[in-house]
Amino acid sequence: MPQQNEFTEYALLADIRTADVQNPQELAAIWGPIRKECTEAGAEVTDSYAVLGEHDFLVLLDAPSRDVCFKASLIMERHGLDVQSMEVVPTEAFGKLVEDL
């Protein structure tokens, strides 16, 4: 459980809603506003990747709470993306969690 001033990392899988995006240039242009709006909501988009496979994008996000991550997901939804968010733990931290098992 993060302490009060710590951020938790989230991985968000995002898919384009084709009816909302008309061309690839429009899609590339949404990331600036998404980053700005997420920052204003208290989250930081640390990385984003275009993905080959089942999903269109992977977004890594730091947020102080689940509620802030939820707000960031809704911001992305407003920009034409369907988003699935998951809390992630670095493998080193995971190793420490399970070392006594």
What are these regions (language model features)?
Residues 11-15, 49-73:
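Short, well-ordered beta-strand segments in beta-rich or mixed alpha/beta enzyme
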Residues 63-92:
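An amphipathic, aromatic/His-enriched active-site/gating alpha helix that lines ligand/cofactor pockets
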Residues 1-40, 44-46, 93-101:
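Short S/T/G/P-rich N-terminal loop/turn motif that feeds into the first structured element of a domain
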